[in-house]
């Protein structure tokens, strides 16, 4: 039940079926990529250098909170390198044969994108090591005493991996990535540009203050910004003339219970529980999760990152602690 509530949450940064239209408005090239200036500049250099040498780009690990554009960046890398993108995820690769099938279907210059790579099984990791280092695939033929190992040569390819939990990657896997990029929460100016661009592509008339209002409440996350834009568009059609300004955007988001800080009922409930049941902390994440009837992963991946980044909560060795700012503003 808690999982369903989280999935229905408007400002849930995890991707859902409702986000499918976003594929039509995602940037396709680095020149169109908004925000993350350090990552963008570095990737421009790395990609241009690899193309000039006619080599595959080094294997790339992208990590950071959900909804910041890891999949979008993987698509851009494939397009910029002129290869095809083959996508999968850690939980999907259950058997060695699953990964072997994907690797043997790659062509030179292709990009293999593995989302949630921290969820790979050890067996799959072992197959990846020689594939990443030497472009070789070791497979077993036969069973029992007659079984033998053979090596298959793979074309040069780039593994692009994404994770929200870089700390869960094993050292041998992490060390095999030549490029490691961390995506940060977006500032309001960059999110405003993203919202304005999306509205233009969706052919929704919108003023600058309308874009700013949506960006302010989007929790530093483009996926949430695009989702809020679609709901504000609905409100503008029904309660207005179809165009979005600051007042319309504010009224729509107030109706949707997303406040000016980008917080909703689950954020406020988290803070209330930490304040009332645990006297502001420190409190262990398992205890807070149990009190909210959520799982630990949901708190760590979905609720806490933005609260911590905004300075409402501290993550200490002894547990979670409310800051004075959270108490002053929300309790």
UniProtKB/Swiss-Prot annotation:
CDD domains xrefs: AAA
Class in the EC hierarchy, top level: hydrolase
Region (Small ATPAse domain (RuvB-S)): 187-257
InterPro entries for this protein: AAA+_ATPase, AAA_lid_4, DNA_helicase_Holl-junc_RuvB, P-loop_NTPase, RuvB-like_N, RuvB_C, WH-like_DNA-bd_sf, WH_DNA-bd_sf
Keyword Transcription regulation: no
Entry EC number(s): 3.6.4.-
SMART domains assigned to the protein according to its UniProt record, in alphabetical order: AAA
Notes concerning its domains: Has 3 domains, the large (RuvB-L) and small ATPase (RuvB-S) domains and the C-terminal head (RuvB-H) domain. The head domain binds DNA, while the ATPase domains jointly bind ATP, ADP or are empty depending on the state of the subunit in the translocation cycle. During a single DNA translocation step the structure of each domain remains the same, but their relative positions change.
Protein name: Holliday junction branch migration complex subunit RuvB
The organism of origin for this protein: Psychrobacter arcticus (strain DSM 17307 / VKM B-2377 / 273-4)
């Amino acid at each position: 039940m808690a999982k369903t509530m989280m999935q229905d949450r408007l400002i849930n940064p995890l991707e859902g079926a409702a986000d499918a239209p976003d594929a039509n408005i995602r940037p396709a090239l680095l020149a169109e990529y908004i925000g993350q200036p350090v990552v963008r500049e570095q990737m421009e250099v790395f990609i241009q250098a690899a193309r000039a040498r006619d080599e595959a780009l080094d294997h790339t690990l992208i990590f950071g909170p959900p909804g910041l554009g890891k999949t979008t960046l993987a698509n851009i890398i494939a397009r910029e390198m002129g290869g095809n993108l083959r996508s999968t995820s850690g939980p999907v690769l259950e058997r060695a044969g699953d990964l072997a099938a994907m690797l043997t279907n790659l062509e030179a210059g292709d990009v293999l994108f593995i989302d949630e790579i921290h969820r790979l099984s050890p067996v799959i990791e072992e197959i990846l090591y020689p594939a990443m280092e030497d472009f070789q695939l070791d497979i077993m033929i036969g069973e029992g005493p007659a079984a033998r190992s053979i090596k298959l040569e793979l074309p040069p390819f780039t593994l692009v991996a994404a994770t929200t939990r870089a700390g869960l990657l094993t050292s041998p896997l992490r060390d095999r990535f030549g490029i490691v990029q961390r995506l940060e929460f977006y500032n309001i100016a960059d999110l405003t540009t993203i919202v304005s661009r999306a509205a233009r592509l969706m052919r929704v008339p919108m003023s600058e203050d309308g874009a700013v209002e949506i960006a302010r409440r989007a929790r530093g996350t483009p996926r949430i910004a695009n989702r809020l834009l679609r709901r504000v568009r609905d409100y503008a059609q029904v309660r207005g003339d179809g165009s979005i300004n600051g007042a319309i955007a504010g009224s729509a988001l107030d109706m949707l219970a997303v406040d000016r800080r980008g917080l909703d009922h689950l954020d406020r409930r988290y803070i209330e529980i930490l304040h009332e049941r645990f006297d502001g902390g420190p409190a262990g994440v398992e205890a807070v999760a149990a009190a909210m009837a959520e799982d630990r992963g949901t708190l760590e991946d979905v609720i806490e990152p933005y609260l911590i980044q905004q300075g409402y909560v501290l993550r200490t060795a002894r547990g979670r602690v409310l800051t004075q700012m959270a108490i002053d503003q929300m309790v």
